From Swiss-Prot:
The modification Pyruvic acid (Ser) is found at S25. Belongs to the PanD family. It comes from the Bacteria. It comes from Acidothermus cellulolyticus (strain ATCC 43068 / DSM 8971 / 11B). It is found in: Cytoplasm. One of its GO terms (molecular function) is aspartate 1-decarboxylase activity. The keyword Lyase applies. Transmembrane segments: none annotated. GO terms for cellular component: cytosol. PANTHER family: ASPARTATE 1-DECARBOXYLASE. This is Aspartate 1-decarboxylase. Is synthesized initially as an inactive proenzyme, which is activated by self-cleavage at a specific serine bond to produce a beta-subunit with a hydroxyl group at its C-terminus and an alpha-subunit with a pyruvoyl group at its N-terminus. Catalyzes the pyruvoyl-dependent decarboxylation of aspartate to produce beta-alanine.
Length: 136
C-alpha cells in the first residue's frame, strides 16, 4: 500500500503577481523551490489564506532571489497579488517509509525570503504569533 504524505510546505508566501493570460502554473523563486525540494514541473497544491480557494498546478522555476510567487493562467481568477498562500507538494510512500517520513517546511517573510525551516507541518515558526496545529 502507498500512502500520500506531505512532502513539502512553503508557509504563508505572498503572491507577487497573477497573470491570467499566461499558459498556466505557479512560478516560484528557485531558492524557495530548493529549500522545499520542489522540482520544476512538480504537482503542487496551493491554498489561499485570504479567500480559502485551493487549487492544483505545476511549478515553473523563477529567478533565484527574486521572491517571485506568480500565479499563472486560469488560477489568476482565484488567487491575487498580495494574497498569502500555502504551497504544498506530496509524495507517495510505502507504509513503512511513510511512518518515518518528515516533510520539509519552509517559512518566509513578507518578501518571500526564507526565515526558517522545519519538519513538523503543524508547528509554527517560533515568535511568529501563529498557533500550533497540535493544540485545540
Amino acid at each position: 500500500m502507498l500512502r500520500t504524505m506531505l512532502h513539502a510546505k512553503i508557509h504563508r508566501a505572498t503572491v507577487t503577481r497573477a497573470d491570467l493570460h499566461y499558459v498556466g502554473s505557479i512560478t516560484l523563486d528557485l531558492d524557495l523551490m530548493e529549500a522545499a525540494d520542489i522540482l520544476p514541473g512538480e504537482l503542487v497544491a496551493v491554498a489561499d489564506i485570504n479567500n480559502g480557494n485551493r487549487l492544483e498546478t505545476y511549478v515553473i522555476a523563477g529567478e533565484r532571489g527574486s521572491g517571485v510567487v506568480g500565479i499563472n493562467g486560469a488560477a489568476a481568477r482565484l488567487v491575487h497579488p498580495g494574497d498569502l498562500v500555502i504551497i504544498m507538494s506530496y509524495v507517495q510512500l510505502p507504509d513503512a517509509e511513510a511512518r518515518r517520513h518528515h516533510p520539509r517546511v519552509v517559512f518566509v517573510d513578507a518578501e518571500n525570503r526564507i526565515i526558517g525551516t522545519g519538519t513538523d507541518p503543524a508547528e509554527p515558526l517560533p515568535g511568529s504569533g501563529l498557533l500550533s496545529g497540535h493544540h485545540t
